[in-house]
Amino acid sequence: MAAADRKITYTAAEVAELIRPLTQSVEALQKENAELKRKLEHMNEILANAQRARFGQSSEKRSYVLSEDQMSLFNEAEICQDSKAEEPTEETLTVKAHARKKKRTIDELAKNLPVEEIVIDLPESRLTCDKCGGTFKLIGKKLVRRELIIIPQSEKILEYYSCTYACDKCEKDTGFAHIITTRTPPPLMKHSLASPSTVADVMTKKYVDGVPLARQEKIWARQGVELSRATMANWVIRCAQSWLKPLYKHMKRQLLEQSVIHADETVVQVLKEDNKPAASESRMWLYASGEYSERHIRIFEYQPDRSGKRPESFLKGFSGCLITDGYAGYNQVQKVTHCGCWAHARRKWREAMPDGATVKTSKAAVGFRYCTKLFSLEKKYIYADVKARKEYRQNVVLPLLEEYFAWLKSIHPEKGSKLEDAVRYSLNQKQQLMAFLDYGDVPISNNLAENAIRPFVVGRKNWLFCDSVKGAESSAIVYSLVETAKANGIEPYGYLLLVLSMLPYLGKSPTHEELEKLMPWHPAVRHREHMRK
């Protein structure tokens, strides 16, 4: 038999041995391909989130998941166009879920402004009728238009003189005159031009309007006043430390007596701080009373770092519910009920959505809808009393959350993905996220704290940094007062003017009762003219 006709036979074991390298190679390639796909998806998530952060809308109130029958944004005009459609009137114009508000009238815009009438009357020379020689008589006047005018800020120097009197009779009878001298009002700062109105104006512009002192210096110069930024900084720090600090401490004591406190923090840079380089990051912490609290309080506190011992120290003596974003540092706070933030949980799902997601069944979309449903349920009982809200949560909200966490356990996301972040956040925070169900006065999110700290974040973009620790501490004091005033519906400048005018009369150690009468929620403050926003 020729060699070519011979058959080569292999046993099963030999065949397995021959293909083993090929099988191993295929398996290795499959694993490598899966890993590359996972990395690609992860990079696409990062890119999509970066584009969303830069170009997308920031609001979380609307759903980002479109059903198949929803129209494209860019085709909406062509799809809906109808030449026979009636124009909506101001009274009937409606949008999804609510009726559009009517435009504000001129009366509403100008209701808090003084009004001066400009009557264009006939001069005496024209009161004689050119047709019959009779005399014109006024039979009425008509409003033709209104104008909003600006009266530029004016400045002046007030010079206080005390008067001295001597008794003539005492001098004649005894040879010594009885002398009395009038007392001038106590100054805000000795040997300084600073007045309550000027310091209140500087503080309001910086801490409410976000105008840095360097820019204020230029504004003053245009008005003919040479007021340096260094002088203004000195005024702010001295007034905050000498006069406003007792109010700040009183507000803090009131805050620690509340049943619910929100907490958040953000970065601040302090140039001149011991044992720290100028470029290092410090922290501004924010503590606020709950949404359903009777007293709306916002307290800012400067600290050199983000250590958990900072909130632990600040909240010493507090034993209520603490609402945070899940930062582990807050776990050092003992004897409190830690409550989570569902807005953060929902945000995680939003970040996990694939770019341009339109499929209702995507896991991120499902998680997002669970959270959105929770917010919708809560909104229905926003005006209910505490007891009714607690019962509603136990009967209606609890089943939804039990379903949500059961669904979470069925998800097995890729490691390192945004989807894994969303799942892990909710599972790790389950106890904190469920805590609000046992209370009727605990909000479901930490949005209140985020909104309260936002003015500081916006202002920081303008003034960038604090020069010294004293400056940072003083900024915390002023921010606390103006944000607490705003939270209580009080106009910030009017409030600062009031307290800076009154505190010098109370001295360096005002009593609890005296400080309480200067709180933004006190009737004595709320009923003052021009104090309401």
PLM regions with names:
Residues 1-193, 262-263, 290, 324, ...:
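Short, flexible loop/hinge motifs at secondary-structure junctions
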Residues 2-6, 126-128, 137, 162-166, ...:
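Catalytic center-proximal scaffold of phosphoryl-transfer enzymes
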